[in-house]
Amino acid sequence: MERYVLSLDEGTTSARAIIFDRESNIIGLGQYEFPQHYPKPGWVEHNPEEIWDAQFRAIKTALERAKVEPSQIAAIGVTNQRETTIVFDRDGKPLYNAIVWQCRRTAEMVEEIKREYGDMIKGKTGLVPDAYFSASKLKWLLDNVPGLREKAEKGEVLFGTVDTFLIYRLTGEHVTDYSNASRTMLFNIKRLDWDDELLEIFGIPEGILPEVRESSEVYGYTKKELLGAEIPVSGDAGDQQAALFGQAGFETGMVKATYGTGSFILANTGKTVRYSDNLLTTIAWGLNGKVTYALEGSIFVTGAAVQWLRDGIKIIKKASETEELATKLESNEGVYFVPAFVGLGAPYWDQFARGLIIGITRGTGREHLARATLEAIAYLTRDVIEEMEKLVGIKELRVDGGATANDFLMQFQADILNRRVVRPVVKETTALGAAYLAGLAVDYWESLEEIESLWKVEKVFEPGMDEETRRKLYHGWKEAVKRAMGWAKVVGI
């Protein structure tokens, strides 16, 4: 009987289930969207039941499309939107809506904590204190949901990020992995345990926290009434860490960039915890008794800038048009676009920066804006990778996400980085990473070496730009960024 691995890829707006065979081919896929809820300005929530319903329907659809029986699934891996915070009872029933990573309701609370404890928190967790991470969201829930803290003190409340909630629903086991725990701002990434001092600062009772396990081990088995089979759930990693694993980024210095609405860049730093003033330090995964660390840079707006060309100023009808427009020009002709719609992320961390288009003349047309937008994505990526290179040597960039289909962008990325850019055959690297972690735990795949042999290159983009052109273009970009920074303060918005 042929066996397969099922990957659950739970994102911010949809839940997917993807079935892979031993050669990493996709043989079945199900995907269902679920809504976000906005009870107040700046607040973002999910209904955990809607997440579960979408995820379970996706599993059923993937099995049907693959014509695979549940008994043929050798293992299940889970990957998820990180930081999103859920509290539920011991029956798995949610006690409030999930507070999503994007939610800013705790921003003021975190600013107060940051002033007093910022350096200590970064030293323990690798994270710059922010409302983005789980700790303040969980504190808000305990402080504001009537009766929740009392129930928590009695042992009637469980906390988890989305992976924990899904695994609990599937197996009844209350667990998470190192990569997801490292995004809560409650986990000591050196000691590899929940940190008592941080729990005290945020007022979190330790009894509600999940057990932290490796990213590849059997956490439990699916309840038979769910799928008609007891399947091991044996892989777990946050979405960006799973993408690095799916790119076979196992060696120190290996880097992946995921180009989505925003972009996330992770560099494997091996067994060493490395700190950067302008990047986050995180755990990539735990495997075979060892933890691998990573540096992470998040870029707030990349693909969203292309969406703005389409939906905002309507100079294109579909994203793919940008490549054709950009290649009509020999150069950017001095036009730069800094897409700081919501400020700038790594390495600038300027929440007051705003979008800027500069260098416009009477001859500027939509092709200039299209090219400037694609180039901006590449410049922003170089900004992050330059920070990473201060701490770890980088030879190439492995890429995934929708924008990697744009050959102009990928070539310009290679040119401006002066590093080769590698696009793999399988684009679903996040789901694939979770599948690999699950499969390794049950010997479906035997080793990292076997996984490396499965990772196939679709296209390599070699740098072809001369050094002087590269220097001039990047200098222009840095000058444009300077002019965009702090603009919201200047105009008082």
UniProtKB/Swiss-Prot annotation:
GO cellular component: cytosol
Pathway(s) of this molecule: Polyol metabolism; glycerol degradation via glycerol kinase pathway; sn-glycerol 3-phosphate from glycerol: step 1/1
Binding site for glycerol: R82, E83, Y132, D239, Q240
Enzyme class: transferase
Domain of life: Archaea
Binding site for ADP: T12, R16, T261, G303, G402, N406
Keyword Nucleotide-binding: yes
EC number: 2.7.1.30
MF terms (GO), sorted A to Z: ATP binding; glycerol kinase activity
Any one GO biological process: glycerol catabolic process
Residues that coordinate or bind sn-glycerol 3-phosphate: T12, R82, E83, Y132, D239
Reaction(s) this enzyme catalyzes, per UniProt: glycerol + ATP = sn-glycerol 3-phosphate + ADP + H(+)
Record-linked InterPro entries: ATPase_NBD, Carb_kinase_FGGY, Carb_kinase_FGGY_CS, FGGY_C, FGGY_N, Glycerol_kin
Chain residues that bind ATP: T12, T13, S14, T261, G303, Q307, G402
This protein's UniProt keywords: ATP-binding, Glycerol metabolism, Kinase, Nucleotide-binding, Transferase
Family the entry assigns: Belongs to the FGGY kinase family.
Function: Key enzyme in the regulation of glycerol uptake and metabolism. Catalyzes the phosphorylation of glycerol to yield sn-glycerol 3-phosphate.
Protein name: Glycerol kinase
Protein encoded by which gene: glpK
